Amino acid sequence: MAASGPAAAAPSGVLVTCGLEQVLEALKLLLSPGGSGSSSLQNTKHDVLLQTLKSNLSALEAKFLKDAQWKKLKALRDELADKAEWPQSSEDITWSFTSQTLLLLLCLKEVLARLVADFNPGKPNPRTPEAAPALSPDTLSVSQQKTFQSVLQFVVTLGVCPYLIPGVGVPLRDRTEFGAVVQDVVRLEAAPHATRRLYICCRVLLDLAQHASLGSLIFCRHFGDIAAGLCQLGFCPTKRKPPGPVEEVLTEEERTLSRRALRDILDQVYQPLAVRELLTLQGGPRQPCTDVKTQLRCRAQAPAWLRRLCGQLLSERLMRPNGVQAVVRGILEGAGAGAAGGSDAEATAADWRKCDLIAKILASCPQQSLSPESYYKDICPQILDLFHLQDKLTARQFQRVATTTFITLSRERPELAAKYLLQPMLAPLQRCLSTAEIPESDMVPGAILVTEEELSRCVEDVFKVYVVANEPVPVLLDSLLPLLRVFFSLYCFTQQSVSHIRSLCQEILLWILVKLERKKAIASLKGFSGLDKTVPTLHPQCQFRAATHGGIVITAKEAISDDEDEALYQKVSSEQSQVEHLGDLLLHCQQCGLAGDFFIFCLKELSHLLEDREAEFTPKPSCYASLLELEHHQTLLIEDQERKLQVLQLLAVLCEKMSEQIFTHVTQVVDFVAATLQRACAGLAHEAESAVGSQTLSMSMGLVAVMLGGAVQLKSSDFAVLKQLLPLLERVSNTYPDPVIQELAADLRITISTHGAFSTDAVSTAAQSTLNQKDPGQKIEEQRQTSPDISTEGAQKPPRTGQGSSGPCTATSQPPGSITTQQFREVLLSACDPEVPTRAAALRTLARWVEQREARALEEQKKLLQIFLENLEHEDSFVYLSAIQGIALLSDVYPEEILVDLLAKYDSGKDKHTPETRMKVGEVLMRVVRALGDMVSKYREPLIHTFLRGVRDPDAAHRASSLANLGELCQCLHFLLGPVVHEVTACLIAVAKTDNDVQVRRAAVHVVVLLLRGLSQKATEVLSDVLRDLYHLLKHVVRLEPDDVAKLHAQLALEELDEIMRNFLFPPQKLEKKIVVLP
């Protein structure tokens, strides 16, 4: 458009030698302020503006006539004026001013072009390659750019904005007060016509924009106004009644040039800027003005033709390469502070609304698109690219847009979303499924099938779309369901090492398991555990491998070893680790009930496997069967046995990892009891009764008795569920050989049938027995804490029984100081129980009572000490560690009475106590020394003598234990170590140099380390007499000791000693001055 007019042609008759500064000075002269504008009357402001424009034009002409240095600039301006196709003078002073300003701007462009043409930069100096190259002469300084920007603002304000029709662009009155004054002083009736003025200004501005230095300054500030003018010039309808002014002024060629120029500048500028300006031109929904006072100030709505045009142009921007990013940036950039720059909450809400708006725009197929499928095929890869921006500041908003678009498209067009969004996102894992066909050329052993970047990006994208968005749309769930087994295998692999996608895999699995229907979730867990072989998994020829940047790659498997035992071991260990990881995963699924449902499923599966005997599984082949049939039969038997082992292994892991909170509602408890009863009935049918099965049956029936006994507030719906147990209870009561269980089953049937209105003593006794098998220190509130389905009101009501039964006894549910004699006796009896968990729990309860200074427990301190000492000899670590804790706490309360007994027990020989018991007493003494702290000085003599005697014990383990306790004691004594420091040092030197056992020598050197660490800077005072001997000992160990661990301890001790001596010889300077105030 600009190149077609004469304004773009370079002047030929005048030698352009005028300087750049002269042109800019002339422009400054036009912009110089005029007379006073202090009056507040509007008419006065108009007059001041017109007078200023006239005076500035007159001053410019006078400067041209009087100043000889400006003659060349005047000649250049006159030549450009002769070439121009528009009138420079008019009755409207605003247009005369605008015309002269445009001519000077063209002069500026010609001067810059000539400077560039004459510029000949010298060759760079090879000796100084780091020097900056010569600056182009058309580069404007900061002050020159400000002058040019001011001139542009006047040109746009006087020559473009006043001639835009209502609804096109931002009205001039709404911008500034000066804009309102300009709108009033412009005379639209004067020649040239308003449309011609707009065309001339837009053409000259586009001509100026062809110069690189000027174009960026023009479009960065005034692109919207120029685009609005071109839209009006090229697309405003011409058929009007009466005929409009556009039709009278512009030719069809000029309108075509305007359309072409609009598309050219839209392609030329920064695309987010183009999108933002087009949205501004398109305008928002019409908002009617109800206030009469403000009706004149309401902004006119954009015309229909302009809205359609902007919509079409925006769609073209969108469907260009990287068009999605341009649209998103155009809407979001510069709007981080919210709609009105308000508070953080308002800004966040505004961002969410904008993201939803962009998602709707992207998810809606434009009308000019050939088909919805072609549109989504083009933009969906760009939507996926929004997840992978590196700039953290903008990545959050872009990811939010991408996630919202993902969800919107998945709801409105699930087929296209699955084809163009989900499949490309999940492709790295889909091509490695067991059901996929991998080309043989790719299966080179060790070849990378999925790179670290691809797999990390896939997992991160799935996490953002599924977990962060948190919208369980059916197409999303269905697309991820076939890949769950691969995700679980990936999760198991990440547990073996450090990887940044470990937590992402776990969150994805937990999210999908919770959002799936319960049947599908259980089926997925079956696939995880290996019970369901039909679930797609990782291709058998593929494997995961750790990558270099903390990620994971998928490679083709290496050649398998011929060692069958090694292969079998790898297979078994892999299955075992996967089951362990499945248990860890289900730990997070207890509250939602999934863990309980899967546990019940495993119990039912076990019952079915017990019911199915080999003969019932498949008929035994006859002697005339073929070898193929025999092999098939043997394969089925092996698979059956393998499935049984898998179920048993899975149940063992679940029982080990799951807590008592696994069941969250009554239905799950009933299902658990039903599975147990069915298994018991199956065992009776095969005459396979066992002690373990009998105990399990008693426990499950006791659990029902607890529920019926009032620990849970049961509703009528709960009794409807409990009635499912009636047939099984009847079968147990008729066929089970144990009369006690028979009677309990019959009584439970009666209690369930009567909804708890009648209950026998057998039910109450079973409930009490079940509760007593729990930890006496716990509150029996499992069922009441896990689910809102189970009310807590039942704990406040008496049991609903016919003959009255005592409620559950909880040993420490009362506050400290309120323990009854009966409760104390029960815990003492539990401390002697043959069951390890019961005994250990009772010991810990007694220790807790001692720690809380319970009066009833402290009165029986001798009895408690006896119980703790007896349990020290127990072989189970849970029991003897609980006893050690109890003795240590008791010694803290009564050190004088108990410490003597402990020292005697520790100092006794092998004939009285086993070495293991003496080691446990040594652990107690170490804890007692730590607990006493500074009070240990009172018992210094007996402790040190006992430990020094222990160093001479024939048992090497006891010698090491004594040295460890001695080191702990020396750390606590500090200065009080002085009287015995020589004895201790001599002992350590002798042991470290002469003892035959390496563990004892290590312990001796470690005592020196503890001694130096405990004393720190006090070592030079406490150990002043023996410090040199200890140093010689440590050097001896470093040089001559064959054991590396002892050498390491000695080196650490030398480092401690070096630090102590440095601080002693060179104390840190304190920059302080002592000031004494005289009286």
Swiss-Prot record:
Keyword annotations: Membrane, Phosphoprotein, Repeat, Transmembrane, Transmembrane helix
Highest taxon listed in the record's lineage: Eukaryota
HEAT repeat residue intervals: 864-902, 937-973
Membrane topology value: Single-pass membrane protein
Listed transmembrane segments: 473-493
Disulphide-bonded residues: none
Compositionally biased spans, kind Polar residues: 785-794, 802-818
Region (Disordered): 767-818
Pfam families registered for this protein in UniProt: ARM_TANGO6, RTP1_C1, RTP1_C2, TANGO6_N
Keyword Transmembrane included in the entry's annotation: yes
GO cellular component: membrane
Principal location: membrane
Location of this chain's protein in the cell: Membrane
Residues bearing PTM Phosphoserine: S561
Family classification: Belongs to the Tango6 family.
Protein name, entry field: Transport and Golgi organization protein 6 homolog
Native species: Mus musculus (Mouse)
Organism classification: Eukaryota, Metazoa, Chordata, Craniata, Vertebrata
